[in-house]
Amino acid sequence: MLFRSGVPDIEGPPTRAQLEGVMGMTAEDLMAKLYPHLSKERHMELFDRCCQVENTYLREHGGVLYPQLEETLEALSQKLPLFIVSNCNAEYIPCFLDAHQLHRYFRDWECIGRTGKQKWENIRLVVERNHLQRPVYVGDTAMDQEAAQKAGVPFLHAAYGFGDVTGAPEITQFPQLLELLQD
């Protein structure tokens, strides 16, 4: 893939632990954390190349899904409108949804790669665009919690994900959403 072809100013691909440590960050923040010795221009050039490789792979192979994800999405979508807000590139969400044929469960989605806006602004944008009355943002990082708070939306911590969060209700398995979001 990208690092197999050689990137002269990078010693090698980031480790799994390093990648997990930057999940949910904006492109600028994650590249600065992974490669502090590179310029901002080089960060974005490298990030764009990584996104191209990632999106191609994702569309063809998909990703690792949480247990009972599709069954839970199907049940939830019959009771509630579902949406996605992410700090990903513009093509990531469509690639992921295409790979797993999950489009039918989501009414709308937004990301920083499409709008250039911060996650909290995109949460607010989706809430306003879809006239949501009682939204809840489910996320797995402190950055998600902060974004939900800034957007004025209640936050539910997905403790099975990548980050640690304090002071928020949590679920430890994806299907628990069915119980919590009943009414």
What is each model feature region?
Residues 86-88:
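Conserved phosphate-coupling serine/threonine residues in phosphotransfer and NTP-handling enzymes
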Residues 13-16, 28, 66, 70, ...:
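Structural motif corresponding to alpha-helix initiation and N-cap regions
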Residues 7-12, 39-41, 101-105:
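Short helix-capping segments at alpha-helix termini
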Residues 56-84, 94, 120:
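Short, acidic loop-to-helix structural element flanking the phosphoryl-transfer center
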Residues 90, 94-183:
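Asp-based, Mg2+/Mn2+-dependent phosphohydrolase catalytic module
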Residues 1-2:
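Short, small-residue-biased leader/transition segments that mark boundaries at the very start
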Residues 32-70:
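Metal-dependent phosphoesterase signature
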Residues 5-7, 26-40, 96:
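Helix-loop "lid/cap" segments that line or gate small-molecule binding pockets
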